[in-house]
Amino acid sequence: MRKLLSALILSFSIWSVFSCRQENNVTVKQYPMFWTWLDYRPGMNFDSVCQVMNDIGMDGIMLNAPTPDDYRIAIPIARKHGIEVYAWLWTMNLEHDRDKILAEHPDWFSVNRNGKSLADTTAYVDYYKFLCPALPEVREFIREKIKSYCEVEGLSGIAIDYNRLVDVVLPTTLWPHYGIVQDREYAAWDYGYHPAMLEKFKSRYGYDPREQQDPSADIKWRQFRCDQITEVANMIAGVVHSYGKTMAASPFPTPKMASRMVRQDWGKWNLDIVFPMVYHTFYTEDVSFISDCTVENVRDKNDKTVLYCGMTATDGPEMFECMDAALNSGAQGIAVFTVAGLRSFEVKKRFKAYTDSVRAVRAANGGIIEAVHPHVADTNPFTHKGIMALVEKRMRRIVAEASGKEELPPLALGEYKQTESYDATRCYRVADENSRTVFKVTFYFYGDVLSGWDVVAE
């Protein structure tokens, strides 16, 4: 009885949160509402994965498979379970054909501001082998690859990924893993300096961006590289649409963040549907990041693009907080990375109840879920209660470690005073009267949202 009551309360709360009105005579194309990304490999038990998806209410899958023929095997299995399949394809970063292209076309690879090519150097990880989008032969290679997948019968769409440059700035929670701080753009990670890219820019604007004192501050140069990626995306869209299929993408969290971090101005892409990867655990670690990004995406996406929200799987209550944050802020559906992360019976059961309820709301409102959150993201870090709680927890841990104690002590914080502001970075200083510790607290704003933070003791 208690489980049934919980399901009824969940259904009622969603109806209340999403109650809205739909204008008459508005026709909205219906896409699958709940998705996952998944790697497909020959020999895997794909039927059992599809059964789990069907059981919990997922009806769309972005599938990454090595060859077009693998999709010809997988699609009938997915369809048996009522699941629509998009090919999840890497574009500017090579995947299944990486070694072949490295051997045959080392001149195709992206170059950083220091003149180092990915053909013979590494950026973060070995599999980062990005191509130069300015090269006609690279575009033709991508075009032919996309065509080969579009020819697969029963494939509903193409969802592109890695259609960008190398991360000039990583999400903040990944910095410790690489032993770096990216409070501004640094040359080693600033890619897009292939000779063909530089020549193309110079022929248009009359100068070499490397001549600038700080090339990262050159807005024309930044936007030019974004536009090269946009041209590739829209070339792909033209191919996909010529086959009558849906064009989708999985870009970074918002167009403004993506433009700064990976030169991916995806609000200008000709997408039918977009699944921005709003992975809050990589950024602020607070669910408010999902709300802020989704609000920005409603504003900055292509008007013809249907907005979804991609998020990491959480095998607990936070999964539903994340989906609420996205749907309340204007997303029309959810993509989870990945379904395998939803493991417990209780979470799967609740996920099914959630998907059923949200679909009912969408159907009752003419195919649309309207936003109920404010239309402007909150850029004041001190009003983000969840983020500030995490900041203070980090402070308490620092004090405890310094004193050799396991118990986290209480804080008596004074006033936060801003000490510095540059590029996307704001620095503050605050003292704890109890421990006599002074903390440096830094917030990062890549795009128009609070995208990361850090705390250290001075």
What does each model-identified segment do?
Residues 87-150:
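Active-site-adjacent "subsite" loops/lids of carbohydrate-active enzymes
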Residues 37, 58-65, 124-140, 218-228, ...:
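The substrate-binding groove and active-site-proximal loops of carbohydrate-active enzymes
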Residues 168, 246-286:
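Substrate-binding cleft/loops of secretory-pathway carbohydrate-active enzymes
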Residues 43-70, 152-153, 271-273, 329:
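Catalytic domains of carbohydrate-active enzymes, especially glycoside hydrolases
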Residues 159, 205, 220-260, 305-315:
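Aromatic-lined carbohydrate-recognition surfaces of secreted/lumenal glycan-active proteins
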Residues 23-47, 251:
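Boundary/entry segment of secreted carbohydrate-active catalytic domains
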Residues 94-122, 163-210:
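Aromatic- and acidic-residue-enriched segments that line the glycan-binding/catalytic groove
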Residues 276-287, 303-370:
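Substrate-binding cleft of secreted/luminal carbohydrate-active enzymes
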